[in-house]
């Protein structure tokens, strides 16, 4: 009886070994594409989808590709005025003051020429 039991055990082992590779071939997905894959690798999607590739120009002229929230081609970092020579600093300040003065002139050109009586008919109720 013991001999029959051991014979059946060996028969089972040989059939399992023989059908093992065939069973593996039937399974079409790879062993890496199971449910644990997400915990082993990074998520292949951006955290913030609305970021655009932009070229960032630093103060020294070097460039870096970054992702920015607005679709632009290039961003330039502002120049530190403390690192400039006094002549360059004065020239930049003069240029900035000229731009500010032109903006003030433009704001002064806007005047209020609205005639209220001309539009009074639109907000008064008429009797029906």
Swiss-Prot record:
Residues 1-33 form a transit peptide. It is found in: Mitochondrion. Its main location: mitochondrion. One of its GO terms (molecular function) is structural constituent of ribosome. Belongs to the mitochondrion-specific ribosomal protein mL55 family. GO terms for cellular component: mitochondrial inner membrane; mitochondrial large ribosomal subunit; mitochondrion. Keywords: Mitochondrion, Phosphoprotein, Ribonucleoprotein, Ribosomal protein, Transit peptide. Component of the mitochondrial large ribosomal subunit (mt-LSU). Mature mammalian 55S mitochondrial ribosomes consist of a small (28S) and a large (39S) subunit. The 28S small subunit contains a 12S ribosomal RNA (12S mt-rRNA) and 30 different proteins. The 39S large subunit contains a 16S rRNA (16S mt-rRNA), a copy of mitochondrial valine transfer RNA (mt-tRNA(Val)), which plays an integral structural role, and 52 different proteins. It comes from Homo sapiens. GO terms for biological process: mitochondrial translation; translation. The modification Phosphoserine is found at residue 85. This is Large ribosomal subunit protein mL55.
